[in-house]
Amino acid sequence: MKPVKILWHKLTPNATIPTKRAEDAGFDIYTTESDVLLQPHEKHLFKTGLAYWIDKEHWLMGVDRGSTGSRGLHIHCGICDQGYRGEIFICICNDNDFPVHFSSSAADRKSVV
């Protein structure tokens, strides 16, 4: 199996290129937003400031990280098709009965190729 080629493009200066260690299942994708308060059972589309290009016959799928569920948060799974060239968003839902504050651009989404 040949390696998948993926190119990241910053749409905003404060965007962070996703990171991936060799042993990771996918990329950690970071938001460009901070100081967001999610009320109980509220969801928010977090901006990433990123677009991407990927080899044909591949796509990105956003899924929960292992630690996300333990904090009462849920990433609404989404697929970014190979031909999509717009900004990637992270939809996070607060499943808790209390507000959750996002103070920095944490890596809250795992993206699997």
Question: What do the PLM-derived regions correspond to, one by one?
Answer:
Residues 1-113:
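DUTPase catalytic domain/fold
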